Regions:
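Active-site gating/metal-coordination segments in enzymes
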Residues: 34, 47-133
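Acidic/histidine-rich helix-loop elements
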Residues: 8-19, 44
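Catalytic pocket-lining loop regions of alpha/beta-barrel enzymes
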Residues: 93-94, 107-216
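Mid-to-C-terminal alpha-helical segments outside catalytic/metal-binding sites
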Residues: 2-7, 18-35, 209-216, 223-257
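Active-site-proximal loop/turn and secondary-structure-junction residues that shape catalytic pockets
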Residues: 42-43, 75, 99-101, 131-133, ...
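Conserved, mostly hydrophobic/aromatic
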Residues: 5, 28, 56, 60, ...
Length: 257
């Protein structure tokens, strides 16, 4: 099993215990997760993400067989193209981009330029809808949730773009998916970490209507319990239990323009 969602490093708005590679590997062993793309959590809030990316590369260097870096690239920051080349040299599996935290909207050409450049290098972009529910956020955490319009704009940026959207709920997934053409839908994968299981059964409904091939396993560790997505899969109704989820590692191998 593969998880494209975890991060290491501290979270600025509350204490997170042991957000380090050794703890992550222990969680992965317990949950049967073979490999992961790993981001650097505090870099989402940095103006210059270079130091955070450097720390990520160094910290994961001893675990590259299982933990591939997913560095944070800001297209509004000078020399982001060099940061993209550094990501390639470091063996990155994907890139992380945080439009709400950077006050970048759906019409920002810099986001589309980055998405196209990443696609040319066969690097998916990981978008995070939210870190926490709006009701529990710190007063200083003023960024809103990632809007569906931004996801749609990036999915339409080019045939080579690939997106993994983390922490989306049923309403946002339906809004975005049914607003895209069939070809554009194939460029987007959704993780299941924020999709409700019983009694609402949102996950089952989405698997029936959109298809299991558009969803990937995800924990959003260390901000969420890694056991929750596995429990939701085990509690699926019989007609969708055992439906094979996609593997984000194969996004470009299975590319549909």
């Amino acid at each position: 099993m593969f998880d494209p969602t975890p991060c290491i490093g501290p979270y600025p708005f509350r204490y997170v215990p042991h957000p380090d590679p050794d703890a992550l590997l222990g969680v992965m062993d317990r949950e049967g997760i073979a490999r992961a793309w790993v981001g650097h959590l505090p870099s989402a809030f940095y103006r210059d993400t270079g130091d955070g990316n450097a720390q990520l590369y160094t910290t994961l260097s001893q675990h590259h067989a299982r933990l591939k870096p997913a560095p944070t690239i800001r297209p509004d920051w000078p020399r982001w193209e060099q940061a993209l080349d550094q990501a390639m040299n470091a063996g990155a599996g994907a890139l992380r981009v945080y439009p709400p935290q950077w006050q970048m909207g759906p019409d920002d050409d810099r986001l589309r330029t980055l998405a196209i450049a990443a696609g040319e290098r066969k690097l998916p972009i990981i978008l995070t809808v939210r870190f926490e529910d709006l009701r529990q956020r710190h007063p200083l955490d003023t960024a809103g949730d990632l809007p569906g319009a931004t996801i749609r704009a990036l999915a339409r940026a080019g045939a080579g773009v690939r997106l993994v959207v983390v922490a989306a709920g049923k309403d946002l997934i339906e809004e975005v998916n049914w607003g895209l053409t069939p070809a554009e839908q194939q460029r987007v994968l959704w993780d299941i970490s924020w999709i409700w299981g019983p009694p609402e059964d949102h996950l089952a409904k989405l698997l029936r209507t959109i298809g299991a091939e558009r969803f990937v396993f995800g924990t959003q560790w260390p901000l969420r319990l890694a056991q929750s997505p596995r429990a939701n899969l085990e509690l699926l109704p019989d007609d969708v239990r055992g439906a094979g989820l996609a593997n984000a590692e194969l996004m470009f191998a299975n590319a549909i323009a």
